[in-house]
Amino acid sequence: MKIFIHLPTWLGDAVMASPALYAIKEHFKNTQFILYGSLVSTALFREFPNSKIIIENKQTRYKQALSLRKELGKIDLSFAFRSAFSSKIILHILKTKQRYFFDKNKHKEEHQVLKYLYFIENSLSIKAHFKDLKLPFKLKFQNPLILKNGKKILGLNPGASFGSAKRWDASYFAKVALNFSQSHEILIFGAGKAEQELCNEIYQILKEQNIKVKNLCNKTTIKTLCQNIAFCDLFITNDSGPMHISTVYKIKTVAIFGPTKFTQTSPWQNQNAKLVHLDLACMPCMQKTCPLKHHKCMKDLKPEKVIEEIKKLSTP
C-alpha cells in the first residue's frame, strides 16, 4: 500500500501534526509513505519509517505533481494537512484513489494538535491511542555543541517565522539571560535574516557583559536544532516552531504569547511549560504585524514577569 501525505508548511504546525502522522502509521502497518512538503517540514520527518521524502517546489508545484504521478505510480490513499486550494489540485493531479483534506474551519477553538488528530480519526473512523508529540530522530547526547562545565543550559529563541508581532524584544531576552548567567550557559537559536539580527543583538549584549554564550542562529539543521533544544535545561521562547520542539522533549519552557491564541498553539501536554502573556483588549489579533502600531502585547510584557515564571519552574 502507498500513502501520500502533504505535510503542514510551518515547522510548528508540522510538529503538532506528528501525533496524527503516527496515528496513520499505526493504522496502516507495513505501508510505504510519501511525505511531501516544505523544506522544514520534510526535514523534520526525514527519518520517518518507510518513507520517501519529496520537497515541494512552490514555483512549479503542478508541473512537479505531474512528474510525480509518473514517478510514483498508483497511490492508494492521500492526506493533505494543508487546507490551501493548491493541495486539492496536487492530489487531483496525482489521481489518488481516496483523498482526505484538512479543514481549518472545523473544531476552530480546539488546540491545533487535536484539530489534526480529529482530521485523521474522522477520515479513517479510528480512535488514536497515541496523542503525544513525537519526532523520528534518534538523538545523541554524548557530544553537545556546548559543554556544561557544571552549569545548566539556558536556550533563547527570539524569533518567530509568522511575523514580527510574535517576537518579544531582544533586549528583554538578554535581560532574562543576564539574570540567570551565573547558573546557566546560554544558547541562542534562530534562522533567517530577520532572526539573525535579533540573535546578534542578544549575543552582543551578553558578550559585552562577559557572559558565556553561543549563537547558533543559521548554524543548525532541523535535526541538530532538535538535538540542541533537547539538551537545554530551560528554554525561553516566543510562540514558534522551536517552542513545539522543546515540548516534544518535555524541556522546562517559558512560552511568551502576544498576538496568537495560546489556547490553540500552546506547548502541548508539557507540564514543564509556563505560559506568559498579558490580557489586553486587542489580544489576540492574529496579525503578522501590530495593526495598532504600538505592539503593547509584547512591549508591556516585561522581563521581570518571565523571570518570575522561571523561578517557579525551578522550584521543586
From Swiss-Prot:
It holds the Pfam family Glyco_transf_9. It catalyses: an L-alpha-D-Hep-(1->5)-[alpha-Kdo-(2->4)]-alpha-Kdo-(2->6)-lipid A + ADP-L-glycero-beta-D-manno-heptose = an L-alpha-D-Hep-(1->3)-L-alpha-D-Hep-(1->5)-[alpha-Kdo-(2->4)]-alpha-Kdo-(2->6)-lipid A + ADP + H(+). Its EC number is 2.4.99.24. Pathway: Bacterial outer membrane biogenesis; LOS core biosynthesis. It is an enzyme of class 2 (transferase). Disruption phenotype: Mutant synthesizes a truncated LOS molecule, but mutation does not affect the mobility and intensity of the high-molecular-weight polysaccharides. SUPFAM superfamilies: UDP-Glycosyltransferase/glycogen phosphorylase. Keywords: Glycosyltransferase, Transferase. One of its GO terms (biological process) is lipopolysaccharide core region biosynthetic process. One of its GO terms (cellular component) is cytosol. One of its GO terms (molecular function) is ADP-heptose-lipopolysaccharide heptosyltransferase activity. InterPro entries: Glyco_trans_9 (IPR002201), LPS_LOS_Heptosyltrfase (IPR051199), RfaF (IPR011910). Coiled coil: none annotated. Glycosyltransferase involved in the biosynthesis of the core oligosaccharide region of lipooligosaccharide (LOS). Catalyzes the addition of the second heptose unit to the heptosyl-Kdo2-lipid A module. Belongs to the glycosyltransferase 9 family. NCBIfam families: heptsyl_trn_II (TIGR02195). PANTHER family: ADP-HEPTOSE--LPS HEPTOSYLTRANSFERASE 2, TETRAACYLDISACCHARIDE 4'-KINASE-RELATED. This is Lipooligosaccharide heptosyltransferase 2. The lineage of its organism: Bacteria, Pseudomonadati, Campylobacterota, Epsilonproteobacteria, Campylobacterales.
